[in-house]
């Protein structure tokens, strides 16, 4: 359902809330915030949110501040954390099994959420999927770090991403093609929980779940490199499958399904057909109207 809520900051947040039938007060379900990229809205992530709900995970696709139905204020990452706070307060959500996934700028929100939580925030996530943007590899002094602690983290880095994974700032030279990202020091450090890549001899195995015990919990790291471009992520059944499968495994989805078991792409297809049908109707309506006395003189 479409929602609009006022956050603790006094701002309006718009969103699409997907609640599976299995989520009840007696049997609270895991939940995840789904965050769109820059210049997009919550609807662009509806396929991912819907597939999470089909697996028994409560999903909230938000409009970031400055987008869609949310308050038109300067962009900041607190909107994603506000979304987590909203989910944690729902009686049918298990606040100990929260996750987040985001694409592009939404992926940066995932990293920001961990920073908010580590600074004493009231809620935290157990798992996240970062897509279409680099995670944090180093601290401000350049030291390699595990910025995500014991949280499970999956990264989806498109081989032909036109914005990220080249090892440079937005205005600087590229140090590698995105398709070669898995062989970089950054990727090696990510899957090895922030270890200095100079000490890592093995190459990164794409699709392998790396595990390490941190703070008494087995944390996971996973890297996927699908053959696609940056913007295709929100429509790609492949990326959607990677996202929902990781979250369903990490959060313990009540109704696990295979990665290819999806309806989201079918929904997008019929939405496109509906758009075509609307234009066909408009053209037909014009032809009908010009045959009436009122418009015959045109």
Question: Where are the model-predicted features located?
Answer:
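Core alpha-helical transmembrane segments of integral membrane proteins
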Residues: 262-298
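Soluble extramembrane regions of membrane proteins in the secretory/endomembrane system
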Residues: 2-263
